[in-house]
Regions:
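Enzymes that bind and transform nitrogen-containing heteroaromatic metabolites
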Residues: 1-129
Length: 129
């Protein structure tokens, strides 16, 4: 488990449960991702699944740390102006600055659909530009 700050009591309790703990640098109130990924590589962990909210997804994209994207679609529509989005962060100002994906696969799981992509570097012009 990676953390930036915790009480000695909490650290001791987690260690007693057998949890491996890594104190990492703080970046904008969260664990700094690049040092964490370096630590994982040193532990011979070469692949992770970052299943989370829009902010972690945005951070991985903005820091060019994501190589693949797996997008699950369910036949349901959620909405509302305050609804969460799959990618948070500041976004990009122009379509040409968007993070590019290359489709690599598609699978159905009952009614749900999994789309698989490679994350490409940089942006290119699109029809709206």
């Amino acid at each position: 488990m990676a953390y930036t700050e915790a009480s000695a009591e909490k650290i001791d309790a987690l260690k007693e449960m057998g949890v491996h703990l890594w104190q990492m640098p703080n970046k904008n109130g969260h664990v700094a991702l690049r040092p964490l990924l370096k630590k994982l590589a040193e532990a011979e962990i070469s692949s992770i699944l970052a299943e989370g909210g829009g902010e972690i997804h945005a951070s991985l994209l903005e820091e060019h740390l994501a190589q693949k994207a797996y997008v699950y679609l369910a036949p349901k529509i959620f909405g509302g102006k305050n609804a969460g989005t799959p990618v948070g962060g500041a976004g990009v100002p122009l379509p040409a600055d968007a993070f590019l994906l290359k489709p690599t696969g598609m699978q159905y799981f009952n009614e749900d659909l999994l789309l698989e992509f490679d994350v490409l570097e940089g942006g290119t012009a699109c029809l709206q530009d």
